[in-house]
A protein has these predicted regions:
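Positively charged n-region of N-terminal signal peptides that target proteins for export
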Residues: 1-4
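C-terminal motif of bacterial Sec signal peptides marking the signal peptidase cleavage site
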Residues: 14-17
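Bacterial signal peptide processing site
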Residues: 19-21
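Low-complexity, acidic Ser/Thr/Pro/Gly-rich terminal tails and inter-domain linkers that flank the onset
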Residues: 25-54
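Structural beta-strand segments of beta-rich domains
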Residues: 58-62
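Asparagine-centered strand-capping/turn motif at beta-strand->loop junctions
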Residues: 66-70
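Short, hydrophobic/aromatic beta-strand segments
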Residues: 72-80
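Extended, well-structured beta-strand/loop surface patches
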Residues: 80-182
Length: 182
């Protein structure tokens, strides 16, 4: 009986010790990264936001840049309506704001070390089967108004190049940033 009692006390101390460590974890940082960069071969992709926290109703500027850093003076890339995709997730409500892309093939020449830049334009999608909260949320984001919440921006590029033998090389560098709307 005494062994069982000691075992029970030991288990309680172990559980209490684990809970104590859990309580000491710092809260998640509210200083979100304003810039993220990734490189795939001769291409740098930068995703940035003007500041980490915004007031509801104020404009939010999210920028993507693609820079060719190779040896040639320039390179031709091929992509859809834009080489950039901006997929957003609002984590408070768990809503996704997907990137929608036109599908024409566009040819663009990038000069070495000169960034090509685009700014995120508001988006959102819903249909007649979407829940009313999602519809209202998307209507606001489509007008460029982000409701209060925490947002994760998963930015990426999607393009390819061709060599003189018409061999395609695909590129899809990506980066992630976050921001809050209060």
């Amino acid at each position: 009986m005494q062994k069982k009692f000691l075992l029970l006390i030991s288990m309680l101390l172990l559980v209490a010790a684990c809970q104590e460590k859990e309580a000491l974890k710092p809260p998640p940082s509210k200083n979100y990264s304003q810039t993220a960069t990734s490189q795939q071969e001769d291409f740098l992709y930068d995703l940035s936001i003007s500041k980490p926290t915004f007031t509801e109703g104020k404009s939010i500027k999210i920028t993507a840049k693609l820079t060719y850093v190779g040896q040639a003076q320039n390179v031709t890339i091929y992509h859809g309506g834009s080489p950039f995709l901006f997929n957003l997730q609002e984590t408070t409500r768990n809503f996704e704001i997907p990137s929608v892309m036109d599908t024409p093939l566009i040819t663009r020449i990038l000069e070495r070390n000169v960034p090509y830049e685009e700014v995120y334009t508001s988006g959102g999608v819903y249909d007649e089967f979407s829940e009313p909260k999602l519809v209202e949320f998307m209507k606001q984001t489509m007008k460029g108004h982000f409701p209060k919440g925490h947002y994760i921006v998963k930015g990426s590029t999607d393009f390819y190049t061709e060599d003189p033998n018409e061999q395609k090389t695909e590129y899809k560098p990506s980066a992630t940033i976050e921001f809050n709307v209060q």
